[in-house]
Regions:
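Short Lys/Arg-rich amphipathic alpha-helical segments
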Residues: 1-91, 108, 112-114, 119-124
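Beta-rich nucleic-acid/ligand-interaction surfaces
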Residues: 99-104
């Protein structure tokens, strides 16, 4: 799980995100349908703080990261999100905040789902 935090993120966004991650049915059931959550399959979460997800490339050729949260706030929200996930019964492993890390991931199938707390309150 790659996590980007904005300065607008707080307890409401943390709770919503943790609940979604714990309960999203994104793993296949016995019939091959995405019908099982990470909790259902006994999975774990690798949580990586990734401010570059807020990279804005609409202008120029150098990304702007002004939408990313200030480091102290971002670290606090990221850690609180990980604790909220643990509160849902998940095992959470963490990367190091603000560190240069090599992280490998394998997308299993054509599924990547962004969760954006800025859209959580919009009507469907």
């Amino acid at each position: 799980m790659l996590v980007a935090v904005s300065d607008d993120d707080g307890p409401e966004q943390i709770d919503w995100t943790a609940r979604k991650i714990a309960n999203l049915r994104i793993f296949d059931d016995d019939e091959g349908k995405m019908n099982r959550s990470v909790l259902d399959v006994g999975g774990e979460v690798l949580s990586i703080s990734q401010f570059t997800l807020y990279g804005d490339v609409r202008r120029g050729n150098r990304p702007s990261f002004v939408a990313a949260g200030q480091p102290d706030h971002a670290r606090d929200v990221w850690l609180r999100l990980d604790e909220a996930l643990r509160g849902h019964g998940l095992t959470v492993r963490e990367g190091r905040f603000a560190a240069h890390m090599r992280v490998s991931l394998t997308n299993d199938g054509p599924v990547t789902i962004p969760l954006d707390t800025a859209v959580m309150a919009r009507p469907r």
